[in-house]
Amino acid sequence: MNLLIMGLPGAGKGTQAAKIVEKFKVAHISTGDMFRAAMANQTEMGVLAKSYIDKGELVPDEVTNGIVKERLSQEDIKETGFLLDGYPRTIDQAHALDAILKDLGIDLDGVINIEVDPSCLLERLSGRIIHRQTGETFHKVFNPPANYNEEDYYQREDDKPETVKRRLDVNIAQGEPILSHYREQNLVHDIQGNQDINDVFSDIEKVLEKLK
């Protein structure tokens, strides 16, 4: 079974990816892990990627796509299948993945898309606060401190509502063309992510049992 998992930041994609891998024994291929392994093993693409990273430059798409192809060419993929997590990030990468899979003779079986309303994600992601003295992390809504005094807490720049909204907007703009691309191929399975973690996974399980 060969799968992609998609979802906006905060939608619970990482949690569900781990559950899918545990239950269905597919290889979990995340972008970060792929890059680290390729660089550690000094593969052709790994060496190229490291040269860009060492200079503080963005790794170009052709190198990222090359690393994906190297990973999908490995023997374990034929036996277990895969769950791609964090790639493709752009429509160009989605087209590149189509070409890679065709070249390797691999069919994509499904795209799991975890849907959560962006306004819920904004609340979820921008509610994190940190105690100035202890460094303890709380959430204004879901895990508030017992005695909340605003002056005693701060927010990281990354967690401020305006920063979170910008990040969500970028992800939505990049993600919509990718989802449309896979919808045209009837591969997308939308999963309601605004429910209990186990209920989300139960919905995913029902989809994947049919794809097995």
From Swiss-Prot:
Q: Does the keyword Ubl conjugation apply?
A: no
Q: Which reaction does it catalyse?
A: AMP + ATP = 2 ADP
**InterPro entries this protein is in?**
Adenyl_kin_sub, Adenylat/UMP-CMP_kin, Adenylat_kinase_CS, ADK_active_lid_dom_sf, P-loop_NTPase
Q: Which UniProt keywords apply?
A: ATP-binding, Cytoplasm, Kinase, Nucleotide biosynthesis, Nucleotide-binding, Transferase
Top-level EC class as recorded in UniProt:
transferase
What Gene3D superfamilies does the record point to? Answer: P-loop containing nucleotide triphosphate hydrolases
Question: Which positions in this protein are listed as binding AMP?
Answer: T31, R36, E57, L58, V59, G86, Y87, P88, R89, Q93, R156, R167
Where, by residue number, does ATP bind? G10, A11, G12, K13, G14, T15, R128, T137, F138, Q195
Region: LID; residue ranges are 127-159
From the Swiss-Prot or TrEMBL record, what is one GO molecular function term? adenylate kinase activity
Question: Which GO BP terms, alphabetically?
Answer: AMP salvage
Compartment(s) where it occurs, according to its Swiss-Prot or TrEMBL record: Cytoplasm
Which Pfam families has this protein been placed in?
ADK (PF00406)
Annotated Gene Ontology cellular components are:
cytoplasm
Q: Where is this region: NMP?
A: 30-59
Pathway listed for it is: Purine metabolism; AMP biosynthesis via salvage pathway; AMP from ADP: step 1/1
Comment, domains = Consists of three domains, a large central CORE domain and two small peripheral domains, NMPbind and LID, which undergo movements during catalysis. The LID domain closes over the site of phosphoryl transfer upon ATP binding. Assembling and dissambling the active center during each catalytic cycle provides an effective means to prevent ATP hydrolysis.
Family statement drawn from the similarity comment of this UniProt entry: Belongs to the adenylate kinase family.
| NCBIfam families associated with the record | adk, PRK00279.1-2, PRK00279.1-3, PRK00279.1-4
Subunit text = Monomer.
Q: What does this protein do?
A: Catalyzes the reversible transfer of the terminal phosphate group between ATP and AMP. Plays an important role in cellular energy homeostasis and in adenine nucleotide metabolism.
Supply the PANTHER family for this chain. NUCLEOTIDE KINASE
Q: Know the name of this protein?
A: Adenylate kinase
Upper lineage:
Bacteria, Bacillati, Bacillota, Bacilli, Lactobacillales
